[in-house]
Amino acid sequence: MKTVPFLSLLQAGILTSGIVAQNIAFVGSNANAIATVSFDTKTGTFKVTGNNTDSSTPSWQEVSRDGKLLYSIEETSTEHALTSYSIGQDGKLKKLKSIKGLAGPVSLDMHPTQPIIITANYGSASASAYSSKDNGELTHLGDFMFKMQGKGKVPDRQDAPHPHQALFDPTGKFVLMPDLGSDLIRILKVDAGQKFSVAPPNKVKPGTGPRHGVLYPASDKPRFYYVVGELSNTVTAMSVEYTVETIKLTEIQTLSTLPDGQRGAAGELILSPSGKHLYASNRLDKVFPGSSSVASYTIDQMTGKLKLLEIFNGGVENIRHMSIHPSGKWFVTEGQNSNDIKVFALDPETGKVTPEAKSTLEIEKPVCLQWWHNGAQESEAPEAGTETECEFDD
């Protein structure tokens, strides 16, 4: 009888589990559903394998750090709820718990090491914090209500604070929140014992309307921060300086996301897995008739400065969210208005996509796509031959 070393089986199991997980994604939509989709990395095609309709207008989703739970928020429902789901081995979702929140949540993020969730609530000029348990139970920790004096440079959009994203820094000591209404990058400080306080914010140019940002490098202590301006259609590069009380951001450079003479409403901003390239989605622009465009940039890793690589056809209308497969070889755009998702082949070295999409998935009003990960995927297999044995300040 042929025998196979247990270690080999263990390694195979770890690798297979990771591969399966990273080839499944969850698509939140304004059609009151979260779809589970499988992805074929050979053909670049999606297939819907599940559809959960337990939540209304699931506007943003995040997978828990251990890959066992999915958290989702409801932007326009009457409950404005934060909801937890268990993730089955096949990626199917089962609703666990739901907790009512403040109006208009549009983004959520999880603390890198603690069971804390932060939401940015665009519609109520606020941020909310929750604690979570392994069984999906959620507890409301508190809210932050933001204020501003008068109106901003774009008064019809900047009549009140509108935090549009919540982003924990890698140290877990701060939360960065682009505030579209106030032209600020607000900072929350995370203290011991799950205590939070408001830290000094950072200003951006009037009329920018900061929407989403990313830290670079994405791991360890970042040196740069990039933020996309919805109202100005720009990407701003900023240096990062950690102080005891806050994260200080200083502008390095600002570039347009559109060709001269074009107008639109910039949406999402994402980094490539390699960290070499940055992508900003445009919405309601006319660069490519009937489709939204995407601007790509190369990153100077020493200075943080950006250089426009290309502006390409995203193939869908109103790219509120976009994503890159963990392999770095596939670029995904989601069309909120065109009811579809496009997949483009992506060259990880050059950062460029193929002119034509490799595949299309029809799905109603997609607004967020998150890849599933799990602990096995993120853990390195042992080398061959080795043995394995919140509380708030007032």
UniProtKB/Swiss-Prot annotation:
Where is this chain glycosylated? N51
Under Pfam families, the record lists: Lactonase
Where in or outside the cell? Secreted
Q: In which pathway does it act?
A: Carbohydrate degradation; pentose phosphate pathway; D-ribulose 5-phosphate from D-glucose 6-phosphate (oxidative stage): step 2/3
EC number(s): the record gives 3.1.1.31
Q: Which InterPro entries match?
A: Cycloisomerase_2, Haem_d1_sf, Lactonase_7-beta_prop, WD40/YVTN_repeat-like_dom_sf
What reaction does this catalyse? 6-phospho-D-glucono-1,5-lactone + H2O = 6-phospho-D-gluconate + H(+)
Give the GO molecular function terms.
Answer: 6-phosphogluconolactonase activity
Respond yes or no to whether keyword Zinc is given for this record.
Answer: no
Q: Which GO terms describe its cellular component?
A: extracellular region
Any GO BP: pentose-phosphate shunt
Which keywords are on file for this protein?
Carbohydrate metabolism, Glucose metabolism, Glycoprotein, Hydrolase, Secreted, Signal
Q: Does the keyword Transferase apply?
A: no
Q: Which domain of life is it from?
A: Eukaryota
Q: Where is the signal peptide?
A: 1-21
What does the sequence similarity comment in the record state about its family? Belongs to the cycloisomerase 2 family.
- Task of the protein: Catalyzes the hydrolysis of 6-phosphogluconolactone to 6-phosphogluconate.
Indicate what this protein is called per its UniProt record.
Answer: Probable 6-phosphogluconolactonase ARB_02015
